[in-house]
């Protein structure tokens, strides 16, 4: 089972920071792919790839795909579509059912006003809460609930840097220098 995140409605002049954060949360919280629908924004893709070069991971990334066709093809191949929206069913009421299907999941995260198509084609319209909030927060909460917190303990292949947990300060270990000693940044 794989989870991909489709970012719909990205506006390059306005949304690059938030869309980058959607991609970074997808990676950090255990998604397998990030799709930037309908546009190609090299800054967003470059930022996510730069993080992966340093911090590891094998997140599949694509951009410029037709969002509607991608969703329809996902469903045709037997996957389910989850649209995160504050208007949907509460996550507590559907997360166990979604997890229990054991199918590939495409999570749709909108930027601009989401057209009715996505509400209608989604197998689940899921609300993290029924109040306005960030799509980044919604994705993080959904993935955390889906994986039941296990994603917070992921380690990423090919990492050049890892965090060394510390009660104070910042400690970062360079993996390439592991044999020579620990490198820290304070």
Curated annotation (Swiss-Prot):
Keywords: Cytoplasm, Methyltransferase, S-adenosyl-L-methionine, Transferase, tRNA processing
Positions contributing to S-adenosyl-L-methionine binding: 84, 110-114
Gene Ontology CC annotation, any one: cytoplasm
Catalytic activity reported: cytidine(56) in tRNA + S-adenosyl-L-methionine = 2'-O-methylcytidine(56) in tRNA + S-adenosyl-L-homocysteine + H(+)
Enzyme category, top tier: transferase
GO molecular function: tRNA (cytidine(56)-2'-O)-methyltransferase activity
CDD domains recorded: aTrm56-like (cd18083)
Database matches in InterPro entries: Alpha/beta_knot_MTases (IPR029028), tRNA_m1G_MTases_N (IPR029026), tRNA_mtfrase_aTrm56 (IPR002845)
Pfam families per the UniProt record, alphabetical: Trm56
Enzyme Commission numbers on file: 2.1.1.206
Single GO biological process annotation from the record: tRNA nucleoside ribose methylation
Locations listed in the record: Cytoplasm
Reported function: Specifically catalyzes the AdoMet-dependent 2'-O-ribose methylation of cytidine at position 56 in tRNAs.
PANTHER family in alphabetical order: TRNA (CYTIDINE(56)-2'-O)-METHYLTRANSFERASE
Family of this protein: Belongs to the aTrm56 family.
Subunit structure: Homodimer.
HAMAP family: tRNA_methyltr_aTrm56
Name of the protein: tRNA (cytidine(56)-2'-O)-methyltransferase
Organism per entry: Staphylothermus marinus (strain ATCC 43588 / DSM 3639 / JCM 9404 / F1)
